[in-house]
Amino acid sequence: MGVAPVSNQPLVAQQPKGIIDPSTGKPIGSNDPFFGEINNELADKGFLVTSTDELINWARTGSLMWMTFGLACCAVEMMQLSMPRYDVERFGFAPRASPRQSDVMIVAGTLTNKMAPALRKVYDQMPEPRYVISMGSCANGGGYYHYSYSVVRGCDRIVPIDIYVPGCPPTAEALLYGVLLLQKKIRRTGTIER
């Protein structure tokens, strides 16, 4: 009645292969060392073992909330990042309107002496850990207005900067690359390399 013959060989479950992408049949992220390590651990044990710090850093890199601090023309390129062509939210990088809800501040444009205290105040309102991306030549070092009496020669004189994105104005691709570098930097937080 459809019963398999009894054999003396023990029944062994199939070796788990990790997380399989249904469209390709290969493990997800097979060319990425980070995902390769996760897939190897899943294939070996069937579950993941991690420390709380690693879990928190993993969650932090995938759920960064950014706040715009658009001061000049670079802000237009920064806005492009949220549009459908680049869709930065697919990397877990979502915009927020309040500094109290954001982890990352993107300073885009020329920082004047009158605006510097406001920048510092907004930075101080952000919860720890907080990160700053300096976008464009003006934010990085004064840019075209470097010798002006009313311009701060780089926002790193006011707040600590984690990632510098060069350009006048930098493209949305350059800013997206800066976001990915920031996520990479957050992954290694807690090591000497920070």
From Swiss-Prot:
Annotated keywords: 4Fe-4S, Cell inner membrane, Cell membrane, Iron, Iron-sulfur, Membrane, Metal-binding, NAD, Quinone, Translocase, Transport, Ubiquinone
Record's cofactor remark: Binds 1 [4Fe-4S] cluster.
PROSITE patterns tied to this protein: COMPLEX1_20K
Pfam family, one: Oxidored_q6
GO BP, sorted A to Z: aerobic respiration; electron transport coupled proton transport
Any one Gene Ontology cellular component term annotated for this protein: respiratory chain complex I
UniProt catalytic activity: a quinone + NADH + 5 H(+)(in) = a quinol + NAD(+) + 4 H(+)(out)
Domain of life: Bacteria
Cofactor: [4Fe-4S] cluster
Major localization class: membrane
Cellular compartments annotated: Cell inner membrane
InterPro entries recorded: NADH_UbQ_OxRdtase-like_20kDa, NADH_UQ_OxRdtase_20Kd_su
GO molecular function: 4 iron, 4 sulfur cluster binding; iron ion binding; NADH dehydrogenase (ubiquinone) activity; NADH:ubiquinone reductase (non-electrogenic) activity; quinone binding
Binding-site list for [4Fe-4S] cluster: C73, C74, C138, C168
Membrane association type: Peripheral membrane protein
EC number: 7.1.1.-
Assembly: NDH-1 is composed of 14 different subunits. Subunits NuoB, C, D, E, F, and G constitute the peripheral sector of the complex.
HAMAP family: NDH1_NuoB
Role description: NDH-1 shuttles electrons from NADH, via FMN and iron-sulfur (Fe-S) centers, to quinones in the respiratory chain. The immediate electron acceptor for the enzyme in this species is believed to be ubiquinone. Couples the redox reaction to proton translocation (for every two electrons transferred, four hydrogen ions are translocated across the cytoplasmic membrane), and thus conserves the redox energy in a proton gradient.
Family: Belongs to the complex I 20 kDa subunit family.
UniProt-recorded name of the protein: NADH-quinone oxidoreductase subunit B
Name of the gene encoding the protein in the UniProt record: nuoB
